[in-house]
Amino acid sequence: MKNSQGNEVAVTNYGGAIVAIMMPDKDGNYANLIQGHDNIQDVINSPEPFLSVLIGRYGNRICDGKFTLHGKEYQLARNNGKNHLHGGPTGFHTHVWDATR
């Protein structure tokens, strides 16, 4: 996506990964501000699975992968030692998204 000033954002549909944010420096030279992956294979195979992608359904760690709501205990998948992290192994970072302008 590019705005009228020439600033640009590139996002993949896999995990909503931000690939590039192109902005000018003080001299008008455009550069990518994102430290991330160069291609979709790098996103999929990354040892840093949450780098520049959407996280969720929950953000951060849920201790022991469980919580209680209205007196009922829920157990979530554990993907960070004993904890549930950023939506677990099937979080938003693993989904293919549809996008419209």
Q: Regions from the language model: what does each represent?
A:
Residues K2-R101:
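Surface-exposed acidic/polar loop and edge beta-strand patches at domain peripheries
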